[in-house]
Regions:
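Conserved beta-strand elements of the Class I
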Residues: 149, 373, 561-563
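Short acidic, Gly/Ser-rich segments with clustered Asp/Glu that frequently serve as metal-coordination loops
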Residues: 155-161
Length: 673
C-alpha cells in the first residue's frame, strides 16, 4: 500500500484538477468532485483491476459513475491513470472535446457508461453485475472473476430507481457489486436533511446488503471497507462514505468553503478558486499538472497491473486451450455481432395475437441464443415473454444458470439493468411489459439510445383493445412518443431507436429477425393483445425489412392507398372488399417501421407511397403517428382522446375501427379530394 501522505496528496491533485476544469469552463460542479476524490484515488491507484494497454479486456473490473455531474472527478482520476491529457481536461465542456459536461460511454478512455440522470448509473452497474454472474455460470470463474464498482450520491438514493436496484441486487445476492455512496448531505438547492430523513444504512440492510459506514475522506477506512467488500461472498456491499462537499475549498476571505451548497453547481470563482488551489498545494497559474509523487504511485500501479493482468491472461489462455468450444463461443458473444438464428424453426399460428407470435420467436431464441437474457416486470404470462421462460428458468440467488430475469414491478430498474447487462458485454438482453408502462421506461430508452446499446424493448397490449381494463391501461400517445426516437439521430448518424409494430404473426417473425440483427441501436417491438387476421396470401413478409411495403392483393394504379401498422392493417383490409365493389382500386401498405422506410431509396419510397397519391391512414394511436406517411394531402383516422373500458370488439365499433368505417371514411376522403 502507498504512504497515506502521498495518497492524500494524490486526492488533492484530483481536487485541484477538478476545480480547475470547472473554473476554466466557467461551468460545472466542483463540490462533489472534490469531496469524492479520496475514494476515487484509492480505488484507481490500489484496487481497480484493468489492463492499461487493453481497455476493453473482458476480465477487467468495471466502474460505473452514477452522478454524472461529478465528471471532473472522473476525468481527473482517469488522467492520473493516463487516459486523458492535461489538454483534454482544459477542454472540459467545450465543443468537440473528449471531456463533455457529463461522461459519455468511451471504453478506450475508461468510461463504462454515459451518466447524468441520477439513479440510472448504479442500475446499469447492477445489470452488469448480473451479466458477470450469468457469464460466470456458463464460462467459469477463470474468465469471469471481476468486480463491478458503482459510485452513487445523495440524489441517486433519493431517486425512486434506488428502491428497485436495492431490492433486486439484495435479493439476488450480487456479491460482485460494490457501491460507494458519497454521502455529503448537500445537493444543488438544499441540504439533504430538508428533503430526506431516513436511515439509509438500515434500508439497505433490510434489502440484504452488506453495509459499511466510514469516513469517506479517510484513506485507511476506505481501504478497510474495500478489503471487506471484496471478501464478501453472499451480498452486494454498500460503503456509506461520509464525505465533505468541497473538501479543501476556501472562500475569497480565506475561511472554509467546505460543506456549502454554493460549491455544488458553480465554479469556486475568483479569489476563492485561487485560495483553494494554493491551500491544496497547487499553483493557480499552472494548475493543470500531475505532481511527481502522484505520478509515481500511478506508475507503480501500472506495473502492478502488468503482473496481475499477465497472470490472469495466462490463466485465460490455459482455459482457452482446455475449452476451445467455449472459448470460441465466448469470443462470439463478446464480438458485438448479431447471433446466428435459424428463423425457419419459428412456427406461427395464423390469426394469433402478435404478442403470442412474439412468444414463438422468443422460444426459439431461448434455444438458439445461449447468451440471451429475457426479462419481465411481473408480466411474463401477459406480455408473453414466458415463451422464453418456458425454455429456461429464472435467475435466482445462488443460481445464475437460468436466463430469465424476473425484475418484479420495476419497469425503469428493469430497463436500466438490462442495458447494464449489455454494457458489460457478452450478453443480449430483452425485456417486456405493457406498452402503456413504457412511460416508466423513457429515461432508460433515451440513455440506451444515446449510448447506442442494442437492447430489445418488448411492449405488448399496444392499443385501446386492452379493452375492459380501461384508459389507464390503453396506450394512445405512446406510439407517437416512441416513434419520435426514430426521427432523432444518434451521434453516429443513425436513427436513435428502431421501432417495429408488426401487422400479423408472420410479420412478427421478420420484425424479431430485424431486431436481433440490429446491433447498432435499441429496438422497440410493439405487439397486440388480441388476435389479428393474417395478411392476404402471397404477402412477401421479407419486405418488412424495408420498413413499409405493399401487401399482396393490392391493385395496380390504385385510386387510393391505405396505410397502417399493427392490427389496423387487417382492419384496412376488411374495408377493401366494399371499396373494390364500388370500382375503387386500392393499395394496402403495411408500415411496421417508418424509420426503416425513410432509410430506403427515394425511388422505393415513391413506389410504395407516391407523393401525389391519395393516402388514407388508420392508427389506434394519435393521428400524428401516421402523418409523415400520408403526407399533407392525406387523411388519418386515429384516436382523439383516451380510451374507454369495454370489451375490445365493442370499442372497435364505438371508435370506428371496422371495415365498414374504413369504407365510409375512404369514400368521404375521395369525395373531398
Amino acid at each position: 500500500m502507498n504512504d497515506i501522505k502521498v495518497m492524500n496528496h494524490a486526492a488533492d491533485n484530483i481536487r485541484i484538477l477538478a476545480a480547475s476544469m470547472v473554473e476554466k469552463a466557467n461551468s460545472g460542479h466542483p463540490g462533489g468532485a472534490m469531496g469524492g476524490s479520496d475514494f476515487i484515488n484509492v480505488l484507481f491507484s490500489e484496487y481497480l483491476v484493468y489492463d492499461p494497454a487493453d481497455p476493453t479486456w473482458t476480465g477487467r473490473d468495471r466502474f460505473f459513475l452514477d452522478p454524472g455531474h461529478m465528471s471532473p472527478m472522473l476525468y481527473a482520476g482517469l488522467a492520473l491513470r493516463g487516459f486523458f491529457s492535461m489538454e483534454d481536461l482544459k477542454q472540459f465542456r467545450q465543443w468537440g472535446s473528449v471531456t463533455p459536461g457529463h461522461p459519455e460511454l468511451d471504453l478506450q478512455r475508461g468510461i463504462e457508461n454515459s451518466s447524468g440522470p441520477l439513479g440510472q448509473g448504479h442500475a446499469l452497474a447492477a445489470g452488469a453485475a448480473v451479466a458477470e454472474k450469468f457469464l460466470e455460470a456458463r464460462l467459469g470463474s477463470t474468465m469471469m472473476q471481476h468486480k463491478i464498482y458503482a459510485y452513487i450520491s445523495d440524489g441517486a438514493v433519493e431517486e425512486e430507481i434506488s428502491q428497485g436496484v436495492g431490492r433486486i441486487a439484495g435479493n439476488l445476492g450480487l456479491n460482485n457489486l460494490i457501491m460507494f455512496y458519497d454521502s455529503n448531505d448537500i445537493q444543488l438547492s438544499t441540504e439533504c436533511g430538508v428533503v430526506m430523513n431516513e436511515d439509509t444504512e438500515m434500508k439497505y440492510k433490510a434489502w440484504g446488503w452488506n453495509v459499511i459506514k466510514i469516513n469517506g475522506n479517510d484513506v485507511a477506512q476506505i481501504r478497510e471497507a474495500l478489503d471487506a467488500a471484496q471478501k464478501e461472498q453472499d451480498r452486494p456491499t454498500l460503503i456509506i462514505g461520509k464525505t465533505v462537499m468541497g473538501k479543501g475549498a476556501l472562500r475569497a476571505d480565506g475561511t472554509s468553503y467546505e460543506a456549502c451548497i454554493n460549491t455544488h453547481g458553480a465554479p469556486l470563482g475568483g479569489n476563492a478558486y485561487v485560495n483553494t488551489i494554493k491551500h491544496l498545494g497547487g499553483d493557480p497559474e499552472n494548475a493543470f499538472v500531475i505532481f511527481d509523487d502522484v505520478k509515481e504511485i500511478y506508475a507503480k500501479r501500472a506495473e502492478e497491473l502488468k503482473k496481475i493482468v499477465a497472470e490472469r491472461k495466462a490463466a485465460e489462455a490455459e482455459w482457452r486451450k482446455a475449452n476451445p468450444e467455449k472459448a470460441a463461443q465466448m469470443d462470439e458473444w463478446f464480438s458485438g455481432k448479431a447471433p446466428k438464428v435459424d428463423w425457419s424453426k419459428v412456427e406461427q399460428k395464423a390469426g394469433s395475437a402478435t404478442r403470442a407470435a412474439s412468444a414463438a420467436c422468443l422460444g426459439v431464441l431461448a434455444e438458439q441464443v445461449p447468451n440471451m437474457i429475457c426479462a419481465s416486470a411481473d408480466l411474463s404470462n401477459s406480455d408473453k415473454t414466458d415463451g422464453f421462460l418456458k425454455k429456461t428458468k429464472s435467475i435466482v440467488r445462488g443460481d445464475f444458470s437460468g436466463a430469465f430475469f424476473q425484475a418484479g414491478v420495476a419497469e425503469l430498474t428493469m430497463a436500466d439493468m438490462c442495458i447494464g447487462m449489455m454494457l458489460h458485454g457478452g450478453v443480449v438482453a430483452a425485456m417486456g411489459t405493457f406498452f402503456v408502462f413504457s412511460d416508466y421506461m423513457k429515461p432508460a430508452v433515451r440513455i440506451a439510445a444515446l449510448m447506442q446499446v442494442p437492447v430489445k424493448f418488448i411492449w405488448t397490449h399496444d392499443a385501446f383493445r386492452v379493452g375492459e381494463d380501461g384508459p389507464t391501461h390503453e396506450p394512445v400517445e405512446q406510439e407517437a412518443q416512441i416513434r419520435l426516437m426514430e426521427k432523432l439521430k444518434n451521434h453516429a448518424g443513425k436513427d436513435s431507436v428502431r421501432v417495429f409494430r408488426p401487422a400479423d404473426a408472420d410479420e412478427t417473425t421478420v420484425c424479431w429477425k430485424l431486431a436481433m440483427e440490429n446491433v447498432e441501436t435499441p429496438t422497440a417491438l410493439i405487439f397486440s393483445r388480441q388476435g389479428i387476421a393474417k395478411l392476404p396470401e402471397g404477402t412477401d413478409y421479407e419486405q418488412a425489412a424495408k420498413g413499409a411495403y405493399i401487401v399482396a392483393g393490392s391493385d395496380e394504379n390504385p385510386d387510393v392507398i391505405l396505410v397502417a401498422s399493427g392490427s389496423e392493417v387487417s382492419t384496412l383490409e376488411a374495408g377493401c372488399e366494399a371499396l373494390r365493389a364500388d370500382g375503387i382500386k386500392v393499395r394496402v401498405v403495411s408500415a411496421p417501421s417508418e424509420g426503416l422506410f425513410r432509410g430506403q431509396s427515394k425511388e422505393y419510397q415513391e413506389s410504395v407511397l407516391p407523393k401525389n397519391a391519395k393516402i388514407f391512414g388508420m392508427t389506434a394511436g394519435l393521428p400524428v403517428t401516421l402523418q409523415g406517411l400520408v403526407g399533407a394531402n392525406g387523411k388519418v383516422w386515429g384516436m382523439e382522446s383516451f380510451g374507454f373500458s369495454a370489451p375490445y370488439k365493442v370499442l372497435d365499433e364505438k371508435l370506428g375501427y371496422t371495415g365498414e368505417n374504413v369504407y365510409k371514411q375512404v369514400k368521404a376522403f375521395l369525395a373531398e379530394a
